[in-house]
From Swiss-Prot:
Expression across tissues: Expressed by the venom gland.
Keyword field contains Zinc: no
LCN-type CS-alpha/beta domain: residues covered: 1-66
InterPro entries: LCN-type_CS_alpha_beta_dom (IPR044062), Scorpion_toxin-like (IPR003614), Scorpion_toxin-like_sf (IPR036574), Scorpion_toxinL (IPR018218), Scorpion_toxinL/defensin (IPR002061)
Source organism: Centruroides huichol (Scorpion)
Example GO biological process: defense response
Other comments on record: Is neutralized by the single-chain antibody variable fragment 10FG2. Abundance in venom is approximately 1.8%.
Name by which UniProt lists this protein: Beta-toxin Chui3
Function noted in UniProt: Beta toxins bind voltage-independently at site-4 of sodium channels (Nav) and shift the voltage of activation toward more negative potentials thereby affecting sodium channel activation and promoting spontaneous and repetitive firing. Acts on human sodium channel Nav1.6/SCN8A.
SS bond list: 12-65, 16-41, 25-46, 29-48
Secreted listed as a keyword: yes
Length: 66
C-alpha cells in the first residue's frame, strides 16, 4: 500500500517542499509506519511506500483539512 502521510488530528497531509528524495518524509513515514516504510516528497506532500494494508493514509473520512 502507498499513500500520503496524514495528520490524524486535522486530516491534513504532511507538507514538503523538496520534491523527490526527502529525508523529512522518509523519517516521518518510518516513524508512523515502521522501519520497513519508505517515503519521498510528491506534489508537495509526503508520500509513504511499502505500508501494511491497514495503514491510515490521506484522505481521512469525516475530516477535511482546514
Amino acid at each position: 500500500k502507498e499513500g500520503y502521510l496524514v495528520e490524524l488530528g486535522t486530516g491534513c497531509k504532511y507538507e514538503c517542499f523538496k520534491l523527490g528524495d526527502n529525508d523529512y518524509c522518509l523519517r516521518e513515514c518510518k516513524a508512523r509506519y515502521g522501519k520497513g516504510a519508505g517515503g519521498y516528497c510528491y506534489a508537495f506532500g509526503c508520500w509513504c511506500t511499502q505500508l501494511y494494508e491497514q495503514a491510515v493514509v490521506w484522505p481521512l473520512k469525516n475530516k477535511t483539512c482546514r
